[in-house]
């Protein structure tokens, strides 16, 4: 073999060895610094409800080293059951998805728990109940409200909207297929999915390349997106109507993802217009995060999981407390203009 070819092969082999050493070192570092999860699924798929996917009741799993426990109703809690409503208790139920479940964060540090703690400094009788389930959209929020929430005798409904995935139907329809036995509950993972290094860095590169090479199919994709928007916004309107009929104050907190705050403004603007048209009480938390200038990377659980950490939850709780705290006395009076109005006046979009 010619010397030039030998040198080329030597350079290639050296680069491959260096890459393998780098990957191995990165893998070891990530596994040493990121707590493991227990791995078992907390979900059950069922045709007993049109939610199709529910969390198993009275179970505990570990998410990134933090316990996630459910109560007898199948919602995140640190108690086995939601206690009976006490005299003069002001009960807030929170509907939402994975950013409200907040797996990977201690129960005491998720924003619903923090909100309860902070509002109790104003009124010790406040109780905040987390009724969120990962992967849900407004269609399922509505079902949770009607199937579970109203039976808990709430005094207020708080919807935690997550624009990044709330106006889609693909996850919901996949849940239905699994419940019907037409799709597997968990798809087998490729070998590289077990590597922390790939999940932290390689997947993003692969997704970026895929987004460039694979374009959605024009009219069909537009139709599906429009259908998803209409069905989920209609569900929000029905939630608002139910709240009005029950004379329950309603607030909609719109939560940002932990990536690309500025790019999210377009979608938040669309939701802002919808809220104003429908007179829905929406609070734009994206602007609250941008104003605080906290680096987005400091709000994620870790490099493998972009779900919110303790700092993100603390910001959400602080914003909600600043909006709801001053008007808590009016919220408690169902005969006041506040309780019967279509909007929560302090919880409107400011931008």
Report the location of each language-model feature.
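Hydrophobic membrane-insertion alpha-helices, especially the h-region
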Residues: 11-27
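Histidine-centered active-site loop/cap adjacent to the catalytic His
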Residues: 14, 301-345
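Generic structural signal for small/hydrophobic residues in well-ordered secondary structure
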Residues: 27, 97, 141, 157, ...
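Membrane/wall-proximal cationic-aromatic binding patches
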Residues: 34-123, 289-293, 299-303, 351
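Conserved SGNH/GDSL esterase-like catalytic core that processes O-acyl groups on lipids
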Residues: 67-69, 91-93, 99-185
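Loop/turn elements at helix/coil->beta-strand transitions in domains of secreted/extracellular proteins
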Residues: 89-90, 124-126, 152-157, 244-251, ...
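Solvent-exposed, polar/charged alpha-helical surfaces in well-ordered, non-transmembrane soluble domains
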Residues: 113, 117, 143, 234-237, ...
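Serine-dependent acyl-ester chemistry module
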Residues: 162-280, 285-298, 302, 334-351
């Amino acid at each position: 073999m010619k010397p030039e070819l030998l040198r080329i092969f030597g350079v290639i082999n050296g680069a491959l060895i260096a890459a393998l050493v780098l990957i191995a070192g990165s893998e070891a570092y990530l596994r040493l610094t990121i707590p493991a999860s227990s791995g078992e699924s907390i979900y059950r798929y069922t045709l007993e409800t049109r939610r199709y996917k529910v969390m198993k009741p009275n179970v505990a799993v570990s998410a990134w080293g933090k316990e996630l426990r459910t109560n007898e109703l199948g919602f995140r809690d640190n108690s086995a059951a939601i206690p009976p409503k006490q005299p003069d208790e002001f009960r807030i139920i929170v509907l939402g998805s994975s950013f409200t479940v907040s797996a990977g964060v201690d129960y005491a540090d998720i924003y619903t728990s923090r909100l309860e703690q902070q509002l109790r400094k104003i009124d010790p009788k406040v109780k905040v109940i987390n009724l969120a389930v990962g992967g849900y959209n407004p269609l399922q929020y509505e079902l949770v409200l009607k199937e579970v929430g109203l039976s808990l005798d709430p005094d207020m409904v708080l919807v935690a909207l997550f624009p990044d995935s709330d106006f889609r139907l693909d996850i919901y329809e996949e849940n239905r297929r699994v419940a019907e036995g037409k799709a597997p509950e968990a798809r087998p993972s490729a070998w590289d999915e077990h590597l922390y290094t790939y999940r932290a860095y390689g997947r993003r590169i692969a997704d970026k390349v895929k987004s460039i090479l694979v374009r959605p199919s024009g009219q069909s994709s537009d139709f599906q997106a429009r259908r998803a928007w209409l069905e989920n916004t209609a569900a929000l309107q029905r939630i608002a109507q139910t709240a009005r009929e029950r004379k329950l104050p309603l607030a909609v907190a719109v939560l940002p993802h932990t990536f690309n705050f500025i790019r999210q403004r377009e979608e938040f603007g669309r939701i802002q217009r919808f809220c104003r048209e429908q007179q829905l009480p929406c609070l734009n938390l994206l602007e609250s995060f941008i104003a605080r200038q906290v680096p987005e990377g400091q709000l994620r659980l870790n490099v493998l999981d972009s779900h919110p950490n303790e700092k993100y939850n603390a910001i959400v709780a602080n914003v909600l407390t600043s909006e709801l705290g001053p008007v808590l006395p009016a919220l408690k009076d169902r005969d006041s203009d506040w309780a019967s109005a279509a909007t929560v006046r302090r919880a409107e979009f400011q931008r």
